[in-house]
Amino acid sequence: MIKKIQIAFIFVSITLSQDGLTISGKITDKVSGLALAGANVFETTTEKGTSTNVEGEYLLLLPEGNYKLKVSYIGYNSIDSEVYLNKNITINFQLVPDPIAMRSIDVSGIAPDHNIKSTEISVERLSIRQVEQIPVVMGETDIMKTIQLLPGITSIAEGRSGYIVRGSGIDQNLILMDGMPIYYSSHMQGLYSIFNSDAVKGLTVYKGGVPARFGGRGASVLDVQMRDGDIEQYRTSISAGLITSKFSIEAPLVKNKLSLFLAGRSTRLSGGSLYDKINDGTQTGGRLNSDKGSGGKGDDSKGASSGADDFRFFAPNESWYDINGKVIYNINEKQNLNLSFYIGRDSAYTVGFTEWGNRAALLRWENRFANKWLSNTSIVYSKYYTANISGIYYFNSGVSTQSIKQEFSFFPNINNEVRFGITSEYQDFNHGSLEDATLDDGGKFMPGMQGLESALYAENDHKINDKISLYYGIRNSYYHQLGPGDRFTYDEVSNEPIQAEFFSEKSDVMSSYSSLEPRIALTYLLSEQNSFKLSYNRNAQYLRLMSLGAEVEWYDIWMPTTKNIKPMLTDQFAVGYFHNFNNNEIKVSAETYYKILNGAADFEDGLHNYLVDNLEAYVATGEGLAYGFETSVEKPTGKFTGRLSYNYGKSDYKIDVINQGRWYPYRFDKTHSLTMLSNFQLTSNFSVSSTFLYSTGRPVTLPEGYYYISGLPFPYWEGRNKYRLPDYHRLDIGIKYSPTFLKKWTGGIKTTIDVALYNVYDRRNIHTINYVQGENSLFEQVGQSTYGFMPSININIEF
């Protein structure tokens, strides 16, 4: 069936093609390397023109002859070029930003009316310049903290890099770093993300309307594009903050042929120790609210949380580093090789010595092998690992993947963009071992698992006429659980295995699944200023991140689909209205969505650690439902820029063996959230920014009380996620200053000073409820918060 669909895509596109020769290429920002979507290419003699797509690519069809091209984009200096066209040619353009014009234009890197005319719905695009307008956290511009401010996206807890998209779990978010999958995105237990802003040129978040070329997750895709090295001149930057120091280098190893980009960060332990002295902790408190949809009673959150507990991860015995690299080799005007890599590692003394980290690499060959055709071949490696030594015991776990992807892009004319391809990924899961270091064979070993996830896909972004644009795509995914390993049948009551079948070879298929995933989006242009959009997506997910605690931690494990754990299928419907005012200076949007989940997973009650022989038996699946409404008002241009967003959403699960088979709030359900962002560019070198966040507290499961046996307390529960943490809110303020006198004194070296005030009014947002034994041996609730007021400063030098 998929072959027929691909043939149909190609047939439709070919029938729409036109005769003539082509001028094609890519238009980018010369400084940042960011692809410029919506840049104009105009031929002055024939008055024919076109604009670039979201990846900065253009295609112009003309007969043989001499032509004069004018390449322009708002906020950039234009380029005039004369060409003689007697064959299909490729010309890439690099536009230089106009510093004066850039102050008053949208710095997103896309056309100002892209939100109106494109087929994208439930999609957010940000350039690194937009990200840098947000107040920094501990001296670091943070990609993950920034996307948590977007409509429909919230954080899982204070300071965490994990994020929730429309009520779904964080494992339902596919995170890509230049095409490399990332399985854990945090440093320092969530204070920092693994994305170094100096190494990022832009990002795209798909909350819905996910293109068919992406797959494997049910909720969203975060596609982060890493920075390319400058192919003409050397650039270097260094910076230092209270906690971290970092550097970046751009080097044209062979001018216009071979470039290198390298960036690194590391903790400065003395800075961490200093900050620990600034914040000595305060009382925590708050009220726990019963989730009215589930019944229950309120309760007070009592007790204190010490500064030492709150901020101990700043102690000098915790550190991290990461390195980003990218090498681009331009073989000729039609081919290039791209090598990207990432290495990151955390180490800490918490309960013994702990370390975790990511390693990833990608090799991509891009080839414009024929008229209107582009080929991308990628080989990708990614690994996440964690280990802990506590006393005489050693625990380790992780996941690693190796994949290959072949994609073809076909541009028959300016109204169609066709892509189709194939991808295959081998997955190796280490579910953990607990070893006794004093014994040769002592310990507990969890059997590893292996899987192969593959897919065929095809898609077309089709402008039908001046009013209607249609995106349509299909993805056919396959999953095979591979040997060696045991395939068990479990007793439904005890979860003990009652039958086992052993598969000895790596090529043995223990279980198989396939899913057909249609994707469609429609844009109807009501006028040049407003449009109506709708979309439908089906996404299959074969991996799940299983967590025992209320928060996602570095030691949580990824579980593949097996005979006993079915894949999750998510069907999402979205409808939106988009309106731009005053020549695209103000953008208003409103979207509503409805998601149906089949195969939603959660752990059964009674599991207290991962080191059990039959872990998959405790994974229960059922159905889920998420729906909501998002609205946003944005001003992306001018000296004052900002955004106001409000989200309403519900997310509930229903699993037969949990909560007596009744619907219950999913642990990442946050009913209301509000974000306000603002940036004042007071002068060309001085700006002030602020963010305010509010969200409903997330659901938690708490004991109703305790019963005592032989003087020992045993808790008892009634219902899953019956209560809620107190609501979350926070105000941050940032100041950015680039002294011009320093630039003059230092001969052109640019210095930027970032000052950030995190949590200005010192709100102690509770993220976890603990129980301590109080008076009369009774247990009391203690709300634990992490961060209070945190000032920080960072100095960056570019030369």
What do these predicted ranges mean?
Residues L269-S270, L274-Y275, N279-T282, G286-L288, ...:
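C-terminal beta-signal and adjacent terminal beta-strands/loops
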Residues Y385, D428-A437, G442, H480-A500, ...:
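Surface-exposed extracellular loop regions of Gram-negative outer-membrane beta-barrel proteins
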Residues Y593-I596, L615-E704, N796:
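Gram-negative outer-membrane beta-barrel transporters
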Residues S403, P560-K566, Q572, N583-S645, ...:
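Outer membrane beta-barrel strand-and-loop segments of large Gram-negative receptors
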Residues S424-Q529, Y542, I658-G661:
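Signature of Gram-negative outer-membrane beta-barrel scaffolds
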Residues S108-D171, M177-V210, R227:
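Periplasmic N-terminal accessory/gating domains of Gram-negative outer-membrane beta-barrel systems
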Residues T28, A39-T44, S72-Y76, N86-E140, ...:
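Short, acidic, small-residue-rich periplasmic hinge/interaction motif at the N-terminus
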Residues I156, F214, G229-Y234, V254-K257, ...:
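Short loop/turn motifs that connect adjacent beta-strands in outer-membrane beta-barrel proteins
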